[in-house]
Regions:
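Short active-site oxyanion
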Residues: 1, 30-33, 66-69, 112-117
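A generic structural signal for short hydrophobic patches within well-formed alpha-helices
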Residues: 10-11, 40, 125-126
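Residues that scaffold the ATP/ADP-binding catalytic core of kinase and kinase-like folds
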Residues: 13-14, 46, 81, 128
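Active-site-proximal, substrate-binding regions of enzyme catalytic domains
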Residues: 42-87
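Active-site neighborhoods of divalent-metal-dependent phosphate/nucleic-acid chemistry enzymes
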Residues: 70-117
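Acidic, PIN/NYN-like endoribonuclease modules and their adjacent C-terminal/linker elements
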Residues: 108-135
Length: 135
């Protein structure tokens, strides 16, 4: 099984919640684990808002980098992200959710690129065939 781990799942793992323990178990059982580089930026933003000390932030980002393959955006992924974003917008409207972020589309495009499942608790992903939903 191949995984793409999003910000939601990583944060739950760092908090030590039941969802985080499930994330840890999924990671330990996976064949290949990827984290889009934008997830690192999302996590940095969250922890800066919460005023987490820089050493702890760096340690968490290093955990992600040493545990997974950190993937970037190339031209092909960028091209695939556009229609995936529109797909997520339509899904959000049907579900009466706020608009998804472009980050969500990049995460889903990455999962599709690498034939992976997205580990998340983000409602924008609920019900998608690629999703392992944390609940």
């Amino acid at each position: 099984m191949n995984l793409v781990v999003d910000s939601y799942a990583w944060i739950e793992l760092f908090l030590g919640t039941a969802k985080g323990e499930r994330t840890r178990r999924l990671i330990s059982e996976a064949d290949e684990i990827r984290t889009p580089d934008i997830v690192l930026a999302e996590i940095s933003r969250k922890y800066h808002r919460e005023e987490l000390d820089p050493q702890s932030l760096r340690a968490r980002l290093e955990t992600i980098s040493s545990t997974t393959i950190v993937t970037g955006i190339d031209m092909d992924l960028a091209v695939r992200t556009g229609p995936i974003y529109l797909e997520l917008v339509k899904k959000a409207k049907r579900g009466r959710l706020n608009s998804p972020s472009l980050f969500d589309a990049i995460i889903l495009a990455t999962a599709r690129e690498y034939d992976s499942s997205v580990v998340t608790g983000d409602e924008h992903f609920r019900g998608l065939p690629e999703t392992i939903f944390l609940h």
